[in-house]
Amino acid sequence: MTKKDVRILAFESSCDETSTAVIKNGREIESLIVATQIKSHQRFGGVVPEVASRHHIEVITQITKEALDKANATWDDIDAIAVTYGPGLVGALLIGVSAAKAASMATGIPLIGVDHIMGHIMAAQLKDEIEYPALALQVSGGHTEIVLMKDPIHFEIVGDTRDDAAGEAYDKIGRVLGVNYPAGKTIDEWAHKGKDTFHFPRAMMEDDDYDFSFSGLKSAFINTCHHADQIHEELDKYDLAASFQASVVDVLSHKTIRAIKEYKPKTFILGGGVAANHGLRDRLAEEIEKLPADIKPKVILPDLKLCGDNAAMIGAAAYNLYQAGKFSDVNLNADPSLELPYADSMLK
């Protein structure tokens, strides 16, 4: 390893994945370990915070060693320790933060706290170089946001969900359809086999802002299914999935394209767990391709394995903070309600 190389050991434990990674120079994954808990939560239909925290405690020491071993690294090779400190489940976050702080204090290696949403967006940096200014559509179980990035560390929200996040809506309608948690992948697969025959609402699509709302769509879907149950009518699950997904994708793509036209970013990024949705990926790529050459941004769609929660994205984001000298200290604590700053236009 030459002096110009920077290696960061990263921790991620904001929800139901315990992950560690070693990232070199913010772009290269030397190791990535993800201990998933999905099977433990499936029978509950969603994440149980106490169960998640216990699983994090059980594996975090082991996967820290695995990440270092897989990267052929020792603590002497690590330049910084990064950790997600919010947003997320407070108990889950505390496990990662405590482990990272303990490692930092024991080794003297600098600590960097990372916003989980910034991490999701910076997963793109692990695939290709981001040219700034950039615009991201961040879509996950807890967040649906359009984020403007002036540079690698200054982010601001220009559009947000007013109620349910898109990923949350997927999981809730998945329960109605009897799909195991997490439901997103199955709904996406079913949608490709069906047609948009139910024409569910496209909330706020024509509003002159970049905000979203999915509670009305969720209610319309549930009411349609309940009404069919009452009159003993059997609905086609593939058409239901296709109709639901068409509504979500229409709204997300429409508002994203409008934001691209207004802000004229050099790069567009899709981030978050729902970034693995093939319907959304295909539509955005298709709509951006139609834009005039002078405003058509470079498009970075993260690798599917990096759409979910993982420590590699946290290491990528931490590298940018490292270069800017943005370090944390031993007072770093979990912040389950952490938010990126809102653009001035959102505060009026």
UniProtKB/Swiss-Prot annotation:
GO annotation, biological process:
tRNA threonylcarbamoyladenosine modification
Pfam families, per database record = TsaD
Cellular component annotations (GO), alphabetically ordered: cytoplasm
Kindly state what the record says about how the cofactor is bound.
Answer: Binds 1 Fe(2+) ion per subunit.
Q: Which cofactor does it need?
A: Fe(2+)
The keyword Glycoprotein belongs to this UniProt entry's keyword annotation:
no
- Cross-referenced PANTHER family: TRNA N6-ADENOSINE THREONYLCARBAMOYLTRANSFERASE, TRNA N6-ADENOSINE THREONYLCARBAMOYLTRANSFERASE, MITOCHONDRIAL
GO MF terms here are: iron ion binding; N(6)-L-threonylcarbamoyladenine synthase activity
Enzyme Commission numbers on file: 2.3.1.234
Residues at which substrate binds: Q138, V139, S140, G141, G142, D171, G184, D188, N277
Name the family the entry cites: Belongs to the KAE1 / TsaD family.
Annotated HAMAP family: TsaD
Q: Which residues bind Fe cation?
A: H116, H120, D309
Where is it localised? Answer: Cytoplasm
Protein known as: tRNA N6-adenosine threonylcarbamoyltransferase
User: Keyword set for this entry?
Assistant: Acyltransferase, Cytoplasm, Iron, Metal-binding, Transferase, tRNA processing
Q: Which CDD domains match?
A: ASKHA_NBD_TsaD_bac
Q: What does it catalyze?
A: L-threonylcarbamoyladenylate + adenosine(37) in tRNA = N(6)-L-threonylcarbamoyladenosine(37) in tRNA + AMP + H(+)
What is the stated purpose of this protein? Required for the formation of a threonylcarbamoyl group on adenosine at position 37 (t(6)A37) in tRNAs that read codons beginning with adenine. Is involved in the transfer of the threonylcarbamoyl moiety of threonylcarbamoyl-AMP (TC-AMP) to the N6 group of A37, together with TsaE and TsaB. TsaD likely plays a direct catalytic role in this reaction.
